[in-house]
Amino acid sequence: MAKDYSRTQRIGDQMQRELAQLIQREIKDPRLGLVTITGVEVSRDVAHAKVFITVMGQDDAGKIALNMEILNDAAGYLRMLLGKSMKLRSVPQLHFHYDESIRRGAELSALIERAVAEDGRRHGDDETED
């Protein structure tokens, strides 16, 4: 069981590296933003792969959806190119998903900074009253 997990993990890691290069070199759509692949999860049977991406500088939901549409439309082409570059019996179907973790991380960081600043103001006010 542990060996199966490590194999799918290795395949996912290699797919992440290969896809990053393929998207940069082979997808010529000018509407496509600066795509970063944050991770690839491969199913146990290696039939499907979830590809998690972010788009640099894009917070607009419409532009993100457009980038997702472009990548999902190119999934078959990218799968064919992966088949040529990777030595796998069968190449997984690619399913692109937008990775919200970076945006959520920035929101949490801002929330923590705000709480620390507010706490500092409160404690600063308490010290001046004494």
UniProtKB/Swiss-Prot annotation:
GO BP terms, alphabetized: maturation of SSU-rRNA
Principal subcellular localization: cytoplasm
Membership in a protein family: Belongs to the RbfA family.
Keywords: Cytoplasm, Ribosome biogenesis
Gene3D superfamilies assigned: 3.30.300.20
Name of the gene: rbfA
Subunit note: Monomer. Binds 30S ribosomal subunits, but not 50S ribosomal subunits or 70S ribosomes.
SUPFAM superfamilies, alphabetized: Ribosome-binding factor A, RbfA
UniProt-recorded name of the protein: Ribosome-binding factor A
Record InterPro entries: KH_dom-like_a/b (IPR015946), RbfA (IPR000238), RbfA_dom_sf (IPR023799), Ribosome-bd_factorA_CS (IPR020053)
